[in-house]
């Protein structure tokens, strides 16, 4: 029966998606490879090498003897991913286009193309991730009717599919999948979920996929390529000159081309200064970038943030969080960073306060806080508000010691607000 199952696999021209397609073929499925063109390389002198990637994906299909299709989502990528990327930077935030690409392009545009145009029973990608469904359960989703209307039949049981971390914890990519819809996840297979990167390379070497094995792994944002992020952004955004200001004594240390070019935690390259300074705050009104002199300066550390309305993989918040309004779990805001123990506080509007057990370095507006409970990725929310830094709190304590009559009920950030 499995020989009749049709799986459409996204091919990037890299080793991971190539081996994913190979493994699906080995399982006896009817496999179709699809290459997505998401960026117009003609505008960027081929920075992303999209044409070469497409050729490599086509060659994979030839080696595996499977059909090849190419689709263009350049317009959709520009509207749903790149425009948001620029808008977020212009607001002084630090966006993650990879998360939005998976949400809007790979698991929406590509997913619907595979199912509606190619008649796929399931889709597959080369991501290092797992779900709570076995392959055969994924295929059964094709015949599971989605609830109609605003209210679900209370007798209908439709258990949500869980997004689980990959066996290779270092390569795990659930961070980038934390905004994927439940409907798309139900029909998705991740063939590499139980494998290590080294084993994937070994499979490629043993199956004549040398042309993708020899390619360097793509890192960073595709449409930027090897270029400097600041130079790239200034091609699209107007410069807004401002000052670098010391957070400790308000000394002006230098000038910059735009406060939106800097992310909290990064090193600020200030002309004429030999010692390193780091971005700790940004003042969009004045255009100033506040900096501190040490990589471990307390102004870099915070333990409180608030997100926008959280996208839960299961479509609804965990039952414990709904019941108690608070829940212990873990989160991260950068791929591959260590998971941070935290407490979530659920607000009525679906946003959450995140209180880290220990202050973390480099939290920035616009980043995604991705939540985990054990091996399960619960979902994510965009960071829209930050609590005070450890440096600000310390200054407040010092002022209180000097002026004990000062009120301790001054307004500020609090998880209940």
Curated annotation (Swiss-Prot):
- Annotated region described as Disordered, given as residue ranges: 397-417
- What's the domain of life for this entry? Eukaryota
Where composition is biased (Polar residues), the residues are 407-417
Instruction: Provide the alphabetized UniProt keywords.
Output: ATP-binding, Disulfide bond, Mitochondrion, Nucleotide-binding, RNA-binding, Transferase, tRNA processing, tRNA-binding
Q: What does the record give as EC number?
A: 2.8.1.14
What's the stated role of this polypeptide? Catalyzes the 2-thiolation of uridine at the wobble position (U34) of mitochondrial tRNA(Lys), tRNA(Glu) and tRNA(Gln). Required for the formation of 5-taurinomethyl-2-thiouridine (tm5s2U) of mitochondrial tRNA(Lys), tRNA(Glu), and tRNA(Gln) at the wobble position. ATP is required to activate the C2 atom of the wobble base.
This protein is called: Mitochondrial tRNA-specific 2-thiouridylase 1
Please give the organism.
Mus musculus
What taxonomic ancestry is recorded? Eukaryota, Metazoa, Chordata, Craniata, Vertebrata
């Amino acid at each position: 029966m499995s020989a009749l199952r049709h799986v459409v696999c996204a091919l990037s021209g890299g080793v991971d998606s190539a081996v994913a397609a190979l493994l699906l073929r080995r399982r006896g499925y009817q496999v179709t490879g699809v290459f997505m063109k998401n960026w117009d390389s003609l505008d960027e002198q081929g920075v992303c090498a999209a044409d070469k990637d497409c050729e490599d994906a086509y060659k994979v299909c030839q080696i595996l003897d499977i059909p090849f299709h190419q689709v263009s989502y350049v317009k959709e990528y520009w509207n749903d991913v790149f425009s948001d990327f620029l808008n977020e930077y212009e607001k002084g935030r630090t966006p993650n286009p990879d998360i939005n690409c998976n949400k809007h392009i790979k698991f929406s545009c590509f997913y619907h193309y595979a199912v509606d145009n190619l008649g796929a029973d399931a889709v597959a990608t080369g991501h290092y991730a797992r779900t709570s469904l076995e392959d055969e359960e994924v295929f059964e989703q094709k015949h599971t009717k989605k609830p109609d209307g605003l209210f679900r039949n209370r007798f209908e049981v439709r258990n949500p599919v869980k997004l689980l971390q990959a066996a290779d914890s270092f390569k795990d990519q659930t961070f980038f999948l934390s905004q994927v819809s439940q409907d798309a996840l139900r029909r998705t297979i991740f063939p590499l979920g139980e494998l290590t990167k080294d084993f994937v390379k070994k499979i490629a070497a043993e199956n004549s996929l040398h042309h993708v094995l020899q390619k360097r792994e793509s890192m960073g944002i595709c449409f930027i390529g090897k270029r400097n992020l600041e130079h790239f952004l200034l091609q699209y955004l107007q410069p807004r000159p401002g000052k670098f200001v010391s957070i400790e004594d308000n000394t002006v240390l230098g000038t910059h081309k735009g406060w939106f070019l800097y992310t909290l935690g990064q090193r600020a390259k200030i002309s004429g200064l030999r010692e390193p300074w780091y971005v700790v705050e940004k003042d969009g009104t004045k255009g100033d970038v506040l900096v501190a002199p040490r990589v471990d300066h307390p102004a870099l550390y915070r333990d409180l943030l608030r997100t926008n309305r959280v996208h839960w993989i299961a479509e609804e918040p965990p039952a414990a969080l709904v019941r108690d309004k608070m829940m212990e779990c873990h989160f991260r805001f950068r791929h591959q960073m260590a998971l941070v123990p935290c407490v979530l506080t659920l607000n009525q509007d679906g946003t959450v306060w995140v209180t880290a057990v220990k202050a973390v370095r480099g939290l920035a507006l616009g980043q995604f806080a991705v939540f985990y409970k054990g091996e399960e990725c619960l979902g994510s929310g965009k960071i829209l508000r930050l609590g005070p830094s450890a440096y600000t709190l310390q200054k407040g304590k010092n002022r209180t010691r000097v002026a004990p009559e000062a009120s301790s009920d001054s307004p500020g950030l609090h998880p209940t607000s």
